[in-house]
């Protein structure tokens, strides 16, 4: 099977998107069972970032789980997640900071670094602003230390953006962002043991490119994030 991470629903979405073949999910499920085709995805519980110890700025939860958007750059979500790679018995970590657009679910910008620190988040934000000049979305995050410091809040104000934050220990308040981490890790990371940092970094970069341009989503009308984005721009 070329893409062992795909279950029957995603296989059906690909048939519709790539080949204009329209059948119901149950038929695809029957075929998969008859041919012993099943997804190799492994599931794992996700952690939840809690409030920084000494937050300098706390914003209200203005997003309030309203995960819909009428246009690109109306609402952005952000977060940082970690990945491990191994060198003998030594465990190393790298960190991925990303910003997701709620309209088309595209990854607007991302940065990979060796440290989970303020510069990682600042660089991600700066990349997003540079790629989307004039954008003034509602900017939502958890209450991690990177997002609750005055410097970051000032960067948002300077860009004309309004800040929103999840409540403490309420991962669902940043649900679509957490969901993206889950998708990435289930499809390309869990069940694997990376022993080379470059291989892990290349995997992340390749997956984000695949996610934005090739991975169709049913909630986007069986389109990829970039197809949804370009469809709006062409309207």
Tell me the role of every PLM-derived stretch.
Residues 65-108, 114:
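An active-site-proximal beta-strand-loop segment
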Residues 52, 141-143, 149-152, 163-185, ...:
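RNase H-like two-metal-ion nuclease catalytic core shared by retroviral integrases
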Residues 1-71, 170, 224-233:
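Basic, flexible linker segments flanking DNA-binding modules
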Residues 11, 28, 32, 63, ...:
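Mobile genetic element proteins and their domesticated derivatives, centered on retroelements
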Residues 157-161, 183-235:
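C-terminal domain-tail junction helix/linker
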Residues 104-110, 163-166, 190-191:
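Short small-residue beta-strand/loop micro-motif enriched in glycine and branched aliphatics
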Residues 92, 110-132:
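Active-site beta-loop-alpha junctions of metal-dependent nucleic acid enzymes
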Residues 4-8, 24, 55, 59, ...:
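Hydrophobic (often cysteine-bearing) scaffold residues that line and stabilize catalytic clefts
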């Amino acid at each position: 099977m070329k893409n062992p991470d795909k279950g029957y629903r995603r296989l059906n979405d690909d048939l519709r998107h790539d080949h204009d073949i329209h059948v119901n999910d149950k038929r695809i499920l029957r075929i998969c069972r008859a041919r012993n085709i099943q997804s190799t995805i492994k599931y794992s519980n996700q952690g939840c970032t809690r409030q920084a110890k000494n937050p300098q700025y706390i914003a209200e939860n203005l997003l309030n789980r309203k995960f819909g958007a009428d246009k690109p750059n109306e609402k952005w979500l952000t977060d940082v997640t970690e990945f491990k790679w191994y060198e003998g018995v030594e465990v190393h970590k790298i960190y991925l900071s990303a910003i997701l657009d709620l309209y088309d679910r595209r990854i607007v910008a991302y940065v990979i670094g060796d440290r989970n620190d303020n510069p990682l988040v600042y660089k991600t934000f700066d990349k997003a602003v540079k790629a989307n000049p004039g954008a003034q979305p509602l900017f939502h995050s958890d209450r991690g230390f990177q997002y609750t410091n005055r410097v970051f809040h000032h960067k948002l104000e300077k860009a004309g953006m309004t800040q929103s934050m999840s409540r403490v220990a309420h991962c669902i308040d940043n649900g679509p962002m957490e969901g993206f981490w889950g998708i990435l890790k289930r499809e390309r990371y869990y069940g694997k043991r990376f022993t080379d940092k470059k291989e892990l970094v290349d995997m992340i970069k390749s997956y984000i490119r695949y996610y934005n341009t090739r991975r169709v989503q049913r909630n986007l009308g069986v389109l990829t994030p970039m197809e949804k984005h370009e469809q709006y721009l062409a309207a």
